[in-house]
Design a protein with these regions (language model features):
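Intrinsically disordered, low-complexity segments enriched in polar/charged small residues
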Residues: 7-8, 208
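An exposed, glycine/acidic-rich loop-and-rim segment of catalytic or binding clefts
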Residues: 19-285
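Positively charged n-region of N-terminal signal peptides that target proteins for export
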Residues: 1-4
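Hydrophobic h-region of N-terminal signal peptides that target proteins for export
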Residues: 9-17
Length: 285
């Protein structure tokens, strides 16, 4: 009886093992071994806990994030390309996984003023506004790799004074880290030698079922925010901070993204869906 039980347990363990993948099917590093504008680019892999991240120094961009599902099968949960050439000359979306800036999002009328001086930036959005830095930004340049460990990578770029109209030499460092607890963290550090605007961000497109697998409209989401920032028809903030109560922007109680996305609402119409900033509520002590 004992031998029979052991055999059953061993067979069961083998069956469970067969349902789990050995690990993520990573993008080959040779797909990114190239030069862009005379500078070498590469693909780097870091890992922490159950999460594996692949990053390229072209645009300091996240190429893939592999995580296991409840059955232990790994999927890449961000959308992107599998080779460097498609990032250099994208067949579609330019900003997949990229570091965007020096000013993420839009600059109205492609200009801003500091101390009475007007600075003009590229009108690369509807020929009116500046989007994510301009035609070059931080996503179309090769970053220096300062250090790489098993779980982190540090990238650096000096955005020179006057590039695409922005004042100041902007010394920018980004650190991607995957912790032993399977947390993905991004740390930004920027210094400048002139007054300027800095608003750096990362631009991943998440698809939690796996890359390009279905819509996000049935994802359940909650946002601890009582207010959001309305935009005009060209996606420029109006300057108002609006209450979410009674609007499709109220995610304080979790519900699917698609539950109210089809409602008749000026803000949804302006953005053709959700493309807004929420003002996160401070936690009470």
């Amino acid at each position: 009886m004992r031998k029979t039980l052991l055999a059953i347990l061993a067979a069961s363990a083998g069956l469970v093992a067969c349902t789990r993948t050995a690990g993520p099917e990573l993008i080959p590093a040779e797909n990114f071994a190239d030069t862009v504008n005379g500078s070498p680019v590469a693909l780097y892999t870091i890992k922490g806990g159950d999460v594996t991240l692949q990053v390229t120094n072209f645009g300091a961009r996240v190429v893939s994030i592999f995580t296991p599902d409840k059955d232990g099968n790994y999927e890449d949960i961000v959308v992107g390309y599998n080779n460097i050439s498609d990032y250099v000359t994208p067949p579609g979306e330019r900003f997949f996984g990229a570091c965007v800036g020096p000013v993420a999002n839009r600059i109205g009328n492609a200009q801003f003023e500091i101390d009475g001086v007007v600075y003009r930036t590229p009108a690369n959005d509807n020929k009116v506004n500046t989007l994510h830095g301009g035609y070059i930004g931080l996503d179309n340049v090769v970053w220096d790799v300062k250090s790489v460990t098993d779980s982190s990578i540090v990238l650096h770029y000096l955005h020179p004074d006057g590039m695409e109209g922005y004042p100041g030499n902007k010394d920018i460092t980004m650190t991607y880290t995957v912790t032993s607890g399977s947390e993905f963290r991004i740390d930004y550090l920027a210094t400048t030698d002139k007054k300027t605007h800095i608003n750096i961000s990362n631009h991943p497109f998440f698809c939690l079922r796996g890359e390009a697998n279905g819509t996000v409209e049935d994802y359940v989401m909650s946002i601890r925010a009582s207010h959001f920032i309305p935009i005009d028809p060209l996606s420029i903030p109006t300057g108002e901070i609006a209450d979410v109560t009674g609007t499709p922007f109220d995610f304080r109680t979790a519900h699917t993204i698609g539950q109210m996305i089809g409602e008749e609402n000026e803000q949804l119409r302006n953005a053709r869906g959700y493309d807004h900033n929420w003002c996160i509520d401070r936690e009470t002590e």
